[in-house]
Regions:
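SAM-dependent methyltransferases
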Residues: 3-11, 193-194, 212-214, 222-245
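N-terminal glycine-rich phosphate-binding loop and ensuing alpha1 helix
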Residues: 8-65
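Structural beta-sheet core signal
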Residues: 12-14, 58, 110, 135-138
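Residue-level signal for inorganic ion chemistry
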Residues: 14, 31, 40, 97, ...
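Acidic helix N-cap motif at the loop->helix transition within catalytic regions
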Residues: 66-71
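Conserved donor nucleotide-binding strand/loop of the catalytic core
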Residues: 75-88
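Active-site nucleotide-sugar/metal-binding loop of Leloir-type enzymes
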Residues: 92-107
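Conserved core of the sugar-phosphate nucleotidyltransferase
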Residues: 117-208, 245
């Protein structure tokens, strides 16, 4: 646990059961390597570093289980990482992981497998915000003009000040996200992120300021920027090590 004063558990769920067809590779995007390490492992490292997190649930396709097991053996993470068979959709994968959650779970943090530039600080902030309000996400303002369109015709322009582009991590009190997922499944509703499931039940979701560096690696054009960000992270880590010498 996270100290004597914290009696409840904080879980991270990393849905990684997608095929990654937009990347145009036979290898699922979460297992593409950058600096010799799969993207999903880079992401797991951040959650392993986050003091707020007690354990991690990684949702996978059955055919990726062995590959993930090998990577976890190589990494030897300090925190427990549980491999969970995923579903046909992200929402189903998260629901299956929630079914495995221990009874003393307080907060659930859901994060994209291919957002490896999340910081432990962001993870901590999301957990603290969820403790206060019940649900919290990160978002960044839209710098582009956003149009509402139907059949290739503009219906209107949405004011940019009312728009945020949602990111993960998204954190929730356990009972809130569990009920939202259960209700969505019962109603046949498939949301694009977890916060949308809470919204449809009338739940309030706090928005925290996200980061332009917290990119989601989904297509080939994202890879050069990701490599640049990793190089910068390595340089920063080397500078910190020199200062500690």
């Amino acid at each position: 646990m996270n100290g004597a004063l914290c009696a409840m558990r904080v879980l991270a769920i990393i849905p990684a059961a997608g095929a990654g067809v937009r990347m145009g590779s036979e290898t699922p995007k979460q297992f593409l390597s950058i600096d010799g390490v799969p993207i999903v492992v880079h992401t797991l490292r951040k959650f392993n570093e986050a003091e707020t997190i007690d354990e991690i649930y990684l949702g996978l396709r059955p055919e990726d289980m062995e590959r993930a097991h090998v990577e976890l053996q190589r990494e030897q993470f300090q925190k427990p990482v549980h491999l969970v068979p995923g579903g046909a959709t992200r929402q189903q994968t998260v629901s299956l992981a929630l079914q495995k959650a221990p009874s003393d779970t307080e907060i659930v943090v859901v994060h994209d497998a291919v957002r490896p530039f999340v910081s432990p600080e962001m993870i901590h902030l999301s957990v603290e915000a969820a403790r206060k309000s019940g649900a919290a996400i990160f978002g960044v303002p839209s710098v582009d003009t956003v149009k509402q369109v139907e059949r290739q015709t503009i219906l209107g322009t949405i004011p940019r000040e009312r728009i945020v582009l949602a990111q993960t991590p998204q954190a929730f009190r356990f009972h809130i996200i569990k009920e939202a997922c259960d209700r969505a499944e019962a109603d046949g509703y498939d949301g694009t992120d977890e916060s949308s499931l809470v919204e449809r039940l009338g739940g309030a979701v706090t928005v925290l300021m996200g980061s332009d560096r917290n990119i989601k690696i989904t297509k080939p054009s994202d890879l050069p920027l990701a490599r640049l960000f990793f190089a910068q992270e390595h340089e920063q880590a080397e500078r910190r090590e020199k200062l500690l010498m």
